[in-house]
Amino acid sequence: MKLWRLTRAPFVALDGKGAELFGARYAPPGHPVVSLASEAGLAVLVALRYQPPDLAGIPDDFVLGWTESDVTPERVPDPDEATIRACVGEWLESRRSLLAAIRSRVLPEADVIYLNPRHPDATRVPPLTTRPFSFAECLHTPPMLASFKGMT
C-alpha cells in the first residue's frame, strides 16, 4: 500500500520525533509515531487544517511524500475520540504491529495511518520519495471560477 505524508522538508524522516515531543492528534507526547494517510488528498486536507486561513506566512519548503508497505494496518476502533486515544496509546506501547489505521474525521472514506517507529519492522519501510508542494499553487483561484459564479 502507498502511504502519503505532507510535511516540511526538514521533517521527512519517518522517526516520529515531532509527535514524541509534542504529541499527535491521537497520541500523547512521549511516544514517537508517524502520521501518514491512505490517500494523497487526505494528506493535503489534514495539513491544510493546520495552516492559517489566509495561507499567509506558510513556509515554502513543504513536500508531498510517499512510501510503500505490504503490511496490513491494524484497524483502530473509533466510536469516540477517547477510545481512539486509548487504543492508539496501548498499540504504541505494545509494539504489536507496524501500522494502525484510523478512519479519518476529515474524509471518512480514507484512513489516517500511524506508523510505529519503535516496531522492529520500521527499519524496512523505505524513506519518503518527495516532490515540492505549494499550498498557493494547489489552492489558487481557477481561471474559470468567474464563469461558474452565475450558475447557482
Model-derived features: positions:
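Active-site and NAD+-binding cores of ADP-ribose-processing enzymes
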Residues: 2-15, 27-28, 56-152
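Extended catalytic/binding region for NAD+/ADP-ribose chemistry, centered on the ART fold
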Residues: 27-50, 113-118
